[in-house]
C-alpha cells in the first residue's frame, strides 16, 4: 500500500506542476486518500504494538 501511495504522490507532484485537471486531478485525489488511509493505519499499528 505504501508503494501505491508513493506512486500517486509522485503523480500528484507532476500534476501540481502541470495544473490540476482531468486525470491529474483524479490522481491527486487518489494520492490524498491513500495518504490519509496509510496515516490512520500507521497510528493504529503504533497504539496496538504497545498493548501486546
Curated annotation (Swiss-Prot):
<keyword id="KW-0472">Membrane</keyword>
<dbReference type="InterPro" id="IPR009760">
    <property type="entry name" value="DUF1328"/>
</dbReference>
<dbReference type="Pfam" id="PF07043">
    <property type="entry name" value="DUF1328"/>
</dbReference>
<keyword id="KW-0812">Transmembrane</keyword>
<feature type="transmembrane region" description="Helical">
    <location>
        <begin position="5"/>
        <end position="25"/>
    </location>
</feature>
<keyword id="KW-1133">Transmembrane helix</keyword>
<keyword id="KW-1003">Cell membrane</keyword>
<feature type="transmembrane region" description="Helical">
    <location>
        <begin position="27"/>
        <end position="47"/>
    </location>
</feature>
<dbReference type="GO" id="GO:0005886">
    <property type="term" value="C:plasma membrane"/>
</dbReference>
<protein>
    <recommendedName>
        <fullName>UPF0391 membrane protein XCC0220</fullName>
    </recommendedName>
</protein>
<comment type="similarity">
    <text>Belongs to the UPF0391 family.</text>
</comment>
